[in-house]
From Swiss-Prot:
Protein name: Tol-Pal system protein TolB
Signal peptide: 1-23
Organism: Coxiella burnetii (strain RSA 493 / Nine Mile phase I)
Gene3D superfamilies: TolB, C-terminal domain (2.120.10.30), TolB, N-terminal domain (3.40.50.10070)
The protein's assembly and partners: The Tol-Pal system is composed of five core proteins: the inner membrane proteins TolA, TolQ and TolR, the periplasmic protein TolB and the outer membrane protein Pal. They form a network linking the inner and outer membranes and the peptidoglycan layer.
Gene that this sequence comes from: tolB
Keywords: Cell cycle, Cell division, Periplasm, Signal
Length: 437
């Protein structure tokens, strides 16, 4: 039999748009969102131009805001109040609909598939209070990205928190093998709503643990090409790769420090898996956990002064905190017989984690001062949570319909939704930091 070699394709740029058709997000409201801001998104004046994905700009904005859990967006039945100008808006109608804010806009063709898009955010209870008004010139391929940007602006104006609709997600897609072919592993990067997935790396050997650099320009991950584990760093703009670690045994669970100068990783240089810190400038490596236990899944605190990790040092997988100041290690989790995959909330006051209780795996949040645990999801198969950069949503993998899919949950547990994905099993999603300015 001819020996099969790993197939590795480096896809240099993520900027080339590949049109792929997906259905709408599958939104599952788990309980009433009583504090949601009521808002209406009106059809934009001008030609009904479809953004990539066959949705209009108002439709993309509506989905973004609604799926955030922070807004109650009026249904399409109320969107017949289109106004040719701001002066024609029937404010009394929208007040009767108990809408607080209104988004109106217009699209004007500029020729050569370019458009001028303008929008205004209005306080319905004060016709003179235009909360936000912006205009942009973009080409047709940029319309969906612009819609996400408008959603970000609206979200921040009304909540005081920066939106994440223009961020990205990375994940591993595993497509099952047939009789004559090996399973295919693809590292993909997509928009935060799951649209526009772009392959970064394709291999017939496993890919694991993608993690974003703090500037959002690179992704580190584990690849088993050559039948051995190694950690790689890949530039998203150029596709250029750098091998960071290929020590004998395990090379796993990379995690960038907040300043991007160091990488926490897991190696088996001394036997059992231990946490190491790699200086990315000079390659200096130091071990920070020791002993017989299995220590893995490091996650930095926002200030870089401590590190969460998963360990079985007390018998079952639990989460511990390592202090860089004195090297002390303290147990963090006690509820449940399995707690893993931790990460800090942006304020450093609580964490999210994979949690098992009564035999069911779910996503949970724990307050670090009180130890109180809130269950966010508990389908029984939820795993690998990753926080949005504003700390308001988490993305994770779950089993649905017999395969692994992407899902999101709001940090209060009120909103759950499934994202579109290609055929296959989705594993280990990672939410990007804020991108650009």
């Amino acid at each position: 039999m001819q020996k099969r070699h790993p197939i590795i394709y480096l896809l240099i740029t993520l900027l080339i748009f590949v049109p792929v058709s997906y259905g709408a997000l599958d939104l599952e409201l788990t309980k009433g969102v009583t504090a949601a801001i009521p808002i209406a998104i009106m059809p934009f004046a001008g030609p009904s131009v479809l953004a990539p994905g066959d949705e209009t700009i108002p439709q993309v904005i509506k989905n973004d805001l609604q799926n955030s859990g922070q807004f109650r967006v009026t249904g399409s039945g109320n969107l017949d109040q289109t106004a040719a100008s701001l002066e024609q808006i029937d404010y009394s109608y929208w007040r009767k609909q108990k809408v607080n804010a209104l988004v109106v806009g217009a699209i004007n063709p500029l020729g050569m598939r370019r458009y001028r898009v303008a929008f205004t955010l209005i306080n319905v209870f004060d016709s003179n209070n235009r909360l936000l008004s912006e205009s942009f010139n973009v080409n047709a391929k940029e319309l969906r990205n612009l819609a996400h940007h408008i959603s970000d602006l609206i979200y921040q104006k009304l909540t005081g928190v920066r939106g994440v609709f223009s961020t990205k997600i990375a994940y591993v897609l595993v497509q099952a093998s047939s009789e004559n072919t090996a399973a295919k592993y693809t590292l993909e990067v997509a928009d935060a709503d799951g649209f526009n997935p772009q392959p970064l790396l394709v291999s017939d050997m496993p890919i694991m643990s993608p993690t974003w650099s703090p500037d959002g320009n690179k992704i580190a991950y584990v690849s088993f090409e050559g039948h051995r584990a190694a950690i790689y760093l890949q530039d998203l703009a150029t596709g250029r790769r750098q091998r960071l670690s290929e020590a004998p045994g395990i090379n796993g669970a990379p995690a960038f420090s907040p300043d991007g100068k160091q990488l926490a990783l897991v190696l088996t240089k001394t036997g059992n898996p231990k946490i190491y810190i790699l200086n990315l400038a000079d390659g200096h490596l130091r071990e920070i956990t020791k002993g017989w236990s299995i220590d893995t899944e490091p996650a930095w605190s926002p200030d870089g002064k401590s590190l969460l990790f998963t360990s079985n040092r007390d018998g079952t997988p639990q989460i511990y905190n390592y202090s860089f100041a004195d090297g002390s290690i303290n147990r963090v989790t006690y509820r449940g017989d399995y707690n893993a995959r931790p990460s800090f909330m942006p304020d450093g006051k609580s964490i999210i984690m994979m949690h098992r209780e009564n035999g069911l795996f779910g996503i949970a949040r724990q307050d670090l001062s009180t130890g109180q645990v809130q269950i966010l999801s508990e389908s029984g198969t939820d795993e690998s949570p990753s926080l949005a950069p504003n700390g308001k949503m988490a993305i994770y993998a779950m089993e649905y319909g017999g395969r692994g899919v992407l899902a999101q949950v709001s940090i209060d547990g009120q909103i759950k939704l499934r994202l579109p994905a290609r055929n296959g099993n989705v594993q280990e999603p990672a939410w990007s930091p804020y991108l650009g300015v």
